[in-house]
Amino acid sequence: RNLIRKAERSRARDEGRVPRQLDDLDFLLGVSDDTRQGALRFRTPGSDKFLGEPSRVPRLVALPELLHASDELASDDDPSDAVKRLLDTGTTGLGGARPKASVRLDDGSLAIAKFPHSSDSWDVMAWEATALDLLATAGVRTPQHQLTQVGNRSILILRRFDRTRDGVRIGYISAMTATGSSDGDQKDYADLAEAIRDLSRSPVQDLHEFYDRIIASIALGNTDD
């Protein structure tokens, strides 16, 4: 949402007008259809064209340029060039607090590049990759991932879990949606377990995996779940 707001401020400045107050529809349609999360898509009645901002998702070779744009976005109050570059990649559809961008792997499949923040005092991305490696070794399902370096900074590349290798979209909902809660609401593991029982096609299997992930989070000291 912040990137879409920055883009609107930049357009308003270029057009000599006051920035519009954006609503939920603006945020939904301000996302690239190519990189939109899950399987939800939008189009007008009678049209075959899906709605969303156009994007050109770059290959991994563009990581240095994308990292530079990410740093600019974090340091500048209204970095128009950085906003445009990240919008062009379809980055607006990606949630979470860490700076990131959409990229394509060598086989053409969609992935996420997670960048270090300029204010990081330790190698956050390297430790996130280490946590994923530990989970995979313990038998917990993790997305295919790789750690790469640009200069002396780590970038974590994660294959999108909501796309097949052929690009077919896989629908999903967040834990917040599953529990019917809003940002800031206090929910616990029991609430999410109940939602899994109500909504899952394979509740027994999913509850076993959910339990494994709870134990892994505790073992790793993850307090951001």
Where do the PLM segments sit?
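Phosphate/dinucleotide-binding and metal-coordinating scaffold of catalytic cores
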Residues: 1-223
